A protein has these predicted regions:
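The feature marks the mature, well-folded catalytic cores of soluble enzymes
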Residues: 1-350
């Protein structure tokens, strides 16, 4: 057994014990405005599913926004005893990418605060980039060290097995826009230093149409355990994703786990195509699930056959956890899904 937690710097997997989930709640000055009532209700539904398992940290914009959220939760009979409210203005709601990443240093929780630039400057992010510092200054993370770094890195771009392995995509981390002065060797050094990892698995293939993130790993392939990876598989040769996802699958088959064995691979179906108002395809993916204490929240997309197949396959990958489907069709209207809007805060953080 590779006891990574006994090392100086430890990057835990998502199934590590959690103290809470961070949600940066949508408001009327975000791009969610056309769908605000629907996305509000979805955030409330997600909150309802999480609080039996752990706390929810709700980041609200101002007092009027907080009161709106409280009133809505009360109207839905959602108890607030496990909800922690904190104020910080925001450009958008993608907590996975602007939220803090929990590591442990000598078993002490450290929150990594990487720079966030709206996925290579595609969108404004100056307020999102201050959220972690604001929350830390508010005392939301008592006893935690906040380590701010100048490097641009999003939480959705990295996965770990908790055994010293980091899984990521070259298309995102080496895009030449986020960190133009960094080569692969530089990025690998930064990842090793800050996450305490031993090895990096680079996926060079795989994308989703409509994805703004340049192939975040959390849209494509996810660790379910130290020896199991769930991934998006495309079975339709006529689909534009077919060739790239086949190459990704072949690369995953070539990877070895931390003990030198092939990974157990769990193929997830692709949902039926979802289109925006202009007819452009939206990045619906079942790989964007969220692991919480004793459960897994899985995005569904009003596609009964594929939704059920994804839930069944993930139930097999997480036999000791409750599998909870959550309709996330509205989230893909802004090109993300369930994992993208949430960030786990591991034990002893809140």
């Amino acid at each position: 057994m590779n006891n990574q937690a006994d090392k100086g710097r430890f990057f835990p997997p998502e199934w590590y014990p959690q103290s809470g989930i961070m949600l940066t709640w949508p408001h009327q000055d975000t791009d969610w405005l056309p769908w605000l009532a629907e996305v509000d209700a979805l955030y409330a539904r997600i909150t309802r599913e999480i609080i039996p398992h752990e706390r929810v940290l709700v980041v609200y914009r101002d007092e009027e926004h907080r009161q709106h959220i409280v009133n809505m939760l009360q109207s839905m009979d959602i108890p607030s005893s496990e909800i922690l409210f904190t104020q910080s203005d925001s450009n958008d709601t993608w907590a996975r990418d602007h939220g803090p990443i929990t590591v442990y240093d000598q078993q002490h929780p450290v929150l990594l605060d990487f720079g966030f630039d709206g996925w290579g400057g595609k969108f404004k992010a100056e307020r999102d980039n201050l959220i972690n510092k604001t929350l830390h200054a508010h005392g939301i993370f008592p006893g935690c060290t906040l380590q701010s770094l100048d490097i641009i890195l999003e939480g959705g771009s990295i996965e770990t097995d908790g055994q010293g392995t980091l899984l990521t995509t070259s298309r995102c981390l080496l895009d030449g826009i986020r960190n133009p002065s960094l080569q692969r060797r530089d990025m690998e050094r930064i990842l090793r230093e800050n996450f305490g990892i031993d090895r990096i698995l680079w996926l060079d293939h795989g994308y989703l149409a409509g994805d703004d993130t340049d192939s975040h790993i959390d849209t494509l392939a996810r660790f379910c355990s130290a020896d199991t990876i769930a991934y998006v598989a495309c079975k339709d040769p006529a689909d534009e994703h077919y060739a790239e996802l086949l190459k990704m699958e072949q690369q995953l088959q070539d990877f070895r786990d931390y003990q030198g064995n092939p990974y157990h691979l769990v193929p997830l179906p692709m949902p039926r195509p979802h289109l925006d108002e202009e007819g452009n395809r939206l990045p619906a993916t079942y790989a964007n699930f969220l692991i919480i204490n004793d459960a897994v929240l899985v995005p569904t997309y009003e596609d009964p056959h594929n939704d059920q197949e994804a839930l069944t396959r993930l139930a097999g990958a997480f036999p000791e956890r409750q599998i909870i489907g959550v309709n996330c069709s509205v989230l893909i209207q802004q090109h993300g899904s369930l994992h993208c809007i949430s960030m786990q805060l591991l034990k002893d953080v809140i």
